[in-house]
Amino acid sequence: MVKRIITISREFGSGGRFIGEEVAKELGIAYYDKNIISQIAEKSGLSPEYVQENAELSPKRGLFAYAFAGRDITGKSVEDLVHEAQRKVILDLAEKEPCVIIGRNADYILKDRDDVLNVFIHGDMPEKIKRITRLYKVNEQEAVKIMADTDKRLGRNYSFYTDQKWGKASNYTLCLNSSQLGYDRCEKIIVECSK
């Protein structure tokens, strides 16, 4: 079956965003990543800046703090409002057109669809560190910290909203090591598997 929607979850520094962009170009389909922030903001009633900061990485706090966080009249926290708006936007995009969606728990949100290819991109530590130092102009020690913090928050968010383990192979159709395969080969494999 042809896969109209490709979700790409990724470790920080693995090149998942770049690979996703290239896949979308190759297939001639839409690419969604940070460009859906305004749609999420509109649906949630929050500012695009707040959504940008919190959509994929919330909840930042522990469960105790989350339990006592501010709530709206329905009892939902701000993090829950962002997540719910994000879920609605992703479902709308999947109905609207073939596309590549980066992160945002899209693999889980779209898990009941047959036309979705769920991909997880990971990489070897030395390669990810090199990429982060080059792109973010930081030293190796800072790159390791940024990578660890980001992956921890991505994993926490995924687990919190899906009750699944982020990066666990059984949650995805395809898991690719971008360090071992290279970006071009990852792109080609994803394109081929989508047909």
Predicted regions span which residues?
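Conserved phosphate-donor/acceptor-positioning beta-strand/loop module used by diverse small-molecule
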Residues: 112-134, 140-148
